[in-house]
Amino acid sequence: MGFDDTCNTGLVLGLGPSPIPNNYNSTIRQSSVYKLEPSLTLCLSGDPSVTVVTGADQLCRQTSSHSGVSSFSSGRVVKRERDGGEESPEEEEMTERVISDYHEDEEGISARKKLRLTKQQSALLEESFKDHSTLNPKQKQVLARQLNLRPRQVEVWFQNRRARTKLKQTEVDCEFLKKCCETLADENIRLQKEIQELKTLKLTQPFYMHMPASTLTKCPSCERIGGGGGGNGGGGGGSGATAVIVDGSTAKGAFSISSKPHFFNPFTNPSAAC
């Protein structure tokens, strides 16, 4: 029993009579081992010389968990036996790499299960985290040995712990910033009200006319009349003088108010008229 009897694969493309030999189907049927011969034949429709053999015993079923590695390794074995030589170093390295990657994937799937720690392990991890939030490889190895865990599990726990600490600190900062924003909003509203009140007061202020001091002075004739009237009053009754203060300075030519009335006759002194 040779290799050709255990694995007969065929692919025929053609027009006209099938080039398959007559003893092809008989050789396949005479083999007593498991059939591993998936066959595909393309020809003209209605050709009676082509027969497609199908059967449940001709299918090779493999488990899903080992399909990748087994198919790859079997393919390499078939190629090596067909070529009649040994694999090159590059091919051997590729085969080992695929197998190692497969085993790593299996370990990764098993490692994805949630790790349940005891109270003692959790307490020791918390104490270690308080001392050092990050661990170097040596500290990681020592701690993993103490906890009877793998270094990768210790590293993942520290990563998750740092993430939770950062999240809590972010929440605290967010609450503080919210309070600051509320305080600033209230202060802004208060300042806006004060500005509005100041604008209202500015618009409702009474109108005052600014009069310069020169407009409150008397002409020379009025000054003479006022001075003469005060002199005629003499030592009789006391006369009071009222000074008009404009812009912090006394106006020139203060108005004199005498205690006794003085009557002026313009006909007797025509030059005294203004």
Curated annotation (Swiss-Prot):
Q: Give the record's GO CC terms.
A: nucleus
Q: Enumerate the Pfam families for this protein.
A: HALZ, Homeodomain
Q: Where does the record say this protein resides?
A: Nucleus
Question: What sections of the sequence does the record tag as coiled-coil?
Answer: none
> Which GO terms of the molecular function aspect are on file?
DNA-binding transcription factor activity; DNA-binding transcription factor activity, RNA polymerase II-specific; sequence-specific DNA binding
Q: Do you know which InterPro entries this protein is assigned to?
A: HD (IPR001356), HD-ZIP_Homeobox_LZ_Class_II (IPR050762), Homeobox_CS (IPR017970), Homeodomain-like_sf (IPR009057), Leu_zip_homeo (IPR003106)
User: Main subcellular localization, coarse class?
Assistant: nucleus
Role:
Probable transcription factor.
Protein family: Belongs to the HD-ZIP homeobox family. Class II subfamily.
Q: What is this protein called?
A: Homeobox-leucine zipper protein HAT9
Q: Which organism is it from?
A: Arabidopsis thaliana (Mouse-ear cress)
